[in-house]
A protein has these predicted regions:
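Periplasmic-binding protein-like
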Residues: 94-100, 140-163
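Short, hydrophobic alpha-helical packing/hinge segments within bilobed ligand-binding/sensory domains
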Residues: 48, 114-117, 133, 171, ...
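Conserved C-terminal helix/tail region of periplasmic/extracytoplasmic solute-binding proteins
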Residues: 218-248
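A ligand-binding cleft/hinge motif common to bilobed small-molecule-binding domains
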Residues: 119, 125-142
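Ligand-binding "clamshell"
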Residues: 17-21, 136-147
Length: 248
């Protein structure tokens, strides 16, 4: 990071990705939230715990564990139980997911599936990444996207330099360009085309009233990240537990 002039302008959560996990610099970020049809439900959803309400039986879709936010969903389940996921390797989380199962219609892999289920009335609630918002909103104009007040989980996209890179200095220059105020401002302004990227440069003035602005503020204020140095060694076990709990 010391070689990047624009690194100093990154939001703290983005800096932590490089510092804590050893990845390359983050250049964009996504966050997980809840999209729902208030009219179909007759009530609002404000927290992750609301997903476990019996009134939502047979109304929810959540991402498969191999999805970008699959592991984050496991973390949400552990949070619901009030257990630090690292203290039991996810045991409480899968107990919570078993309790959630009656409410789950499907575990999905693509946002297009969520859009189709909303438009057909098959579901009224889904856990999605912010990047899927536009796709689902087009299929279900009345749908509302919320980030729970208690917080959420963010996923950072990073740029890494390969071990045998022959142009390291040039690679750093390109990364610095990608993190610049000009570039991050330009890419964040494309939301109307469904391409808006949430920036990590804290100096970017994102457009008001957009999903990009919403995510940008949430990540700065109350987003956590998944520690993949903890998760990856457990993924095979978790995948088996996931299938036994939700797909058997």
């Amino acid at each position: 990071m010391s070689k990047l002039e624009n690194g100093k302008d990154m939001i703290e959560a983005a800096k932590a990705v490089n510092k804590d996990n050893g990845y390359g610099p983050a250049y964009t970020v996504n966050a997980m939230g809840i999209i729902y049809d208030k009219e179909a439900l007759g009530f609002e959803i404000n927290e992750w715990a609301d997903l476990w309400k019996p009134e939502l039986k047979g109304k929810i879709a959540i991402p498969v564990i191999s999805n970008t936010f699959g592991p984050a969903m496991v973390h949400v389940a552990s949070d619901y139980k009030g257990v630090d996921i690292k203290s039991d390797d996810g045991k409480a989380a899968f107990e919570a997911l078993a309790e959630l199962r009656p409410n789950i219609v499907k575990t999905y892999s693509k946002s297009a599936e969520v859009a189709n289920m909303f438009s057909s009335g098959e579901i009224a609630v889904a856990v999605i990444g912010d990047y899927a918002f536009n796709t689902v909103k087009k299929a279900s104009p009345d749908a509302t996207f919320v980030y729970p007040a208690s917080g959420t989980y963010a996923s950072f996209n990073t740029i890494d330099i390969t071990k045998n890179c022959k142009n390291v200095d040039l690679a750093y220059k390109w990364i610095d360009y990608r993190l610049s105020l000009e570039t991050e401002t330009r890419t964040s302004s494309l939301e109307n085309n469904g391409l808006g990227e949430v920036p990590v440069n804290g100096k970017v003035e994102v457009a008001e009233g957009t999903n990009v602005e919403n995510t940008f503020n949430v990540v700065r204020e109350r987003a956590k990240t998944v520690d993949y140095t903890f998760v990856l060694p457990l993924m095979e076990t978790w995948t088996n537990q996931w299938n036994q709990t939700l797909n058997s």
